[in-house]
Amino acid sequence: MEWYMGKYIRPLSDAVFTIASDDLWIESLAIQQLHTTANLPNMQRVVGMPDLHPGRGYPIGAAFFSVGRFYPARRRGNGAGNRNGPLL
């Protein structure tokens, strides 16, 4: 079996993607939250990672890219995986 990321990056829409194998089970509420988050103003891309699961309104285990707008609610209290770049 070949293991490379291109095989597991799955577009769900123009702005929403998941990184997951065919065997990975992801809760439908988490997918719904990805789409809801992608509809926020200035949100460019939303990517669910293999550990994706539903949160309180926003999915946990995802990466978010927005331009010109910062969403503090997207940051988790423990700071896990947070990377905040400059606002463009």
Swiss-Prot record:
SUPFAM superfamilies: Hypothetical protein PH1602
Biological process annotations from GO: RNA processing
This protein's name: Putative uncharacterized protein YkfJ
Taxonomic source organism: Escherichia coli (strain K12)
